[in-house]
Amino acid sequence: MPEGRAIRFGIIGCGGAAEPVCQAIAASPLAELVMLHDLNLDLARDLAERFHAPFTGALDQLLAHPTLDAVYVAVPHHQLAPLARKALEAGKHALVEKPLALTLVEADALIALAEAQRLALGVFYELRHTTAHRQARELVQAGAIGEVIGVRLQTLIDKPQSYWQSGWSGRWTNPWRGRKDEAGGGVVLMNTSHFLDAVRYITGLEVVDVSAEVGTLAANVEVEDTAAATLRFNNGALGSLFAGAHIPGARRGDEHFDIYGAQGQLRLPDPYGDDPLQVFLRRDWGGLPAGRWQALPGAPAPVYVEAIEAFARAVQQGQAPPTGGRDARQVLAIVLAIYQAAAEKRTIILSRSEATYA
């Protein structure tokens, strides 16, 4: 594919997740929106009118579009893998919403298919594109905080009960989020998975074993709304995780994570927003003074635009996307281990194919 030509996207699924992606495609010179698809024609028509693109209720019509290069797939979790497979089988690159699949078998099949077809398979873990996450990765990889010894993940959200019926946007009603067989999981899979991916990206570490408890304590749904877990990483570092979907009074900044090193620590105080990375170092490093907390300067990044453009460049250059199917598989393995550990009341050791720490 000629480098520099805009990648022509189709949208599969026109619910709440699709709107900011359509905005990002419209804002990028590297991307172009050519068609939208949803079985709910009202949803498809709404986005089509706003973003000046044709729409269809027939997936085959979208996949047969003569100029289509790639699709963005944003549908209920249980439909992600089947629809991504159809796109790949049709010869289209696929950028899929997390978690990509509900089982490792499904994820592995998609990865193998994409590689066999020489197609890009990306997953929309967009936090990698924030300024603070990039700064954190640079500091950790350069050794500024020394060896990573611990991670603390906190996901406190005050979701309305209506979330389980209509999501954040309220654009349509479908109770799939609260059904175990359709969602695959609750607050850990839907929310904390973003942090798990971010920690892998920043530290380069892998989770090797998990102990956990989960519960459904505040909502009338089949999936967890509360979870706590202990993680061990492949360098021996420890991690703690707490997630709650219905925490009264939870505010911006109550979703955050900290990375502790032998020579300093990092706090990402608002991973979804624009708050700067907070840094404490025991030693001077690269112009950063030791012994006090400081906020790193940096302009907020247009995260969705950068995620779309990173995928588009991968397609143009015939390279793997920066957040690919294997990344999503690793996160899914951690989440499934959390659920298994809670169900079986024991520590789950992830396989040696996914980690190196004995």
Describe each PLM feature range:
Residues 1-3, 11, 70-72, 234, ...:
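C-terminal helix-rich "cap/oligomerization" subdomain common to oxidoreductases
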Residues 3, 190, 196-273, 305-318, ...:
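Contiguous beta-strand/loop segments that form the cofactor/metal-binding neighborhood of enzyme cores
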Residues 39, 296-308:
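Active-site loop of classical SDR/Rossmann-like NAD(P)-dependent oxidoreductases
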